[in-house]
A protein has these predicted regions:
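A structural signal for short, well-ordered beta-strand segments
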Residues: 47, 97, 144-150, 221
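Alpha-helical scaffold within the catalytic cores of cyclic-nucleotide enzymes
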Residues: 72-86, 103, 107-146, 171-180
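Catalytic/regulatory signature loops of cyclic-dinucleotide turnover enzymes
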Residues: 149-150, 158-159, 171-194, 215
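Conserved, well-folded catalytic cores of nucleic-acid-processing
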Residues: 20, 24, 123-126, 130, ...
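Regulatory cytosolic signal-relay segments
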Residues: 1-42
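Catalytic strand-loop-helix junctions within cyclic-nucleotide turnover domains
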Residues: 100-111, 146-166, 183-186
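Cytosolic regulatory/linker segments at or just downstream of nucleotide-handling modules
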Residues: 182-235
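Catalytic NTP-binding/metal-coordinating core of nucleotidyl cyclase/transferase enzymes
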Residues: 34-118
């Protein structure tokens, strides 16, 4: 009995560590043996990519403690919102974050899109609250851009024989990161594709078709209606 309890405790500890460092989905896959290079599965998902504004310039002038505090506040806002909405954070990349919201059985596409958008908005609101505390403490406020798309991705292990990474790859992943790069020049905190916008009602508004690096045709983009409408009224 003692050995069984020890094994159960070991598995709980391993699951906690894997979930913390890899995310719930990848942690579950690795714990259940999906650790070979090339292990993969295809899935339809909403892809979310976020990036902290002006990180490079700030990193050059902030102390290490200031930088870590900023990243912690930014990532905490995103991770909490994404997790509550049923998403999976897959990767932190400096000041970037990649997450997916897997689409379940037929009929759940619209709900998944709505949850992903709600997560992005909730993260924005959470960071606004954190910014009030930062400003009160004499620290600079933080802003981030986020992009959303829907597409089929490959979810699994990639890398070399001695080092693997559990992640998602595919055209939709590349597209969403390039769309996010347009948030700042377009003056929008959030941008989404038509593939996602059609499932969230009037929460998003069109902001035109824009050139995306690597694509031959412009891509129709949508932004938060609550942000677009006041901007148009004041134009």
């Amino acid at each position: 009995m003692g050995l069984v309890l020890d094994l159960l405790e070991w598995r709980r500890t391993a699951r906690t560590l894997l979930d913390t460092y890899l995310g719930r989905g990848p942690g579950h896959e690795v714990l259940n043996g999906a650790i070979r290079r090339g292990d993969r599965r295809d899935l339809e998902a909403v892809i979310l990519f976020a990036d902290l504004r002006d990180y490079t310039a700030s990193a050059a002038s902030w102390s290490v403690d200031q930088l870590l505090a900023a990243l912690d506040a930014y990532y905490q806002a995103l991770v909490d919102a994404i997790t509550v909405a049923g998403g999976e954070v897959l990767k932190f990349m400096g000041d970037g974050l990649l997450a997916v919201f897997p689409i379940g059985p037929p009929g759940t596409l619209a709900l998944t899109c709505q949850r992903a958008l709600a997560a992005a908005v909730a993260a924005r609101n959470a960071l606004a609250a954190a910014n009030r505390a930062r400003i009160a403490a004499g620290a600079a406020p933080l802003e981030f851009g986020v992009a959303l798309d829907v597409g089929r991705v490959v979810y699994g292990n990639i890398g070399g024989q001695g080092r693997l990474d559990f992640t998602v790859i595919g055209p939709a992943v590349n597209l969403v990161s390039r769309i996010e790069a347009l948030c700042k020049p377009l003056g929008q905190p959030l941008l989404a594709t038509a593939a996602l916008a059609r499932h969230v009602g009037d929460e998003l508004a069109p902001v035109g078709a824009h050139r995306i690096r690597g694509l031959a045709e412009p891509v129709e983009l949508f932004a938060l209606a609550a942000v677009v409408a006041p901007a148009r009224c004041s134009a």
